[in-house]
Amino acid sequence: MSARFIAVFCLFFTVTAHAQAPRTFSEAKKVAWKLYAPQSTEFYCGCKYNGNRVDLKACGYVPRKNANRADASNGNTSSRPGRSGISASAGKPVGAKTVRATTTCSSAPRRTCTTWCRASVRSMATVTTSVLDGCRCNVGKYGSCLTQVDFKAKKVMPRPSIRGMIARTYFYMSKQYGLRLSKQDRQLYEAWNKTYPVQPWERQRNQTVACVMGRGNEFVGPVNLKACG
């Protein structure tokens, strides 16, 4: 799994006309905190958190350095937008800018695509442990954390419990936004999708996020927008 596929790559870059959908990273971050509060589990290692503090001892996470930062959590997008190659929909406003239909995040101005990506609640991969989040471009072990990072090879192997979600997210982005997947990548994600089927929490998350964004991930399952309060 190459460095650009670190953990979950702007979970479903969904920008819709839904009235409640946030349009900036700040708005998305506020909504995401509320959405993920009941789960209270960060993305990379599955550590529990309370507010912006992570219970490192309970999940066996051992920071490589900067223990103070490791104990903090932050809402963040889980990929580098400039490397994702996601095609933006025509005429979708991105702050004060607009990304044309033929523009991809690999060719558009970094600031433009970053703003577009970060405006989506789906790009918030719960809450991430700060140190591991800061070391996504680097490699090593973090105690009992099952997500492994190989700094030299620039590869990441996410923990088993999130592999299926990662696969279904890529399938969604490939169909909805034209993300190009190599044959090898698609085979890997198909294997993950089969080995790690949709879990109840993933269906619930899909429904909850759909109520905010106005659209669900069909690879996770159907959503009922009429049930949204």
Swiss-Prot record:
Region (Disordered): 69-95
Highest taxon in the source lineage: Bacteria
Cleaved signal peptide residues: 1-19
Cross-referenced InterPro entries: Endonuclease-I, His-Me_finger_sf
Pfam families per record: Endonuclease_1 (PF04231)
GO cellular component, as recorded: extracellular region
Keyword Signal: yes
GO MF annotation list: endonuclease activity
Enzyme class: hydrolase
Keywords linked to the UniProt accession: Endonuclease, Hydrolase, Nuclease, Secreted, Signal
Family: Belongs to the EndA/NucM nuclease family.
Record-given protein name: Extracellular endonuclease
Protein's organism: Pseudomonas fluorescens biotype A
Gene: endX
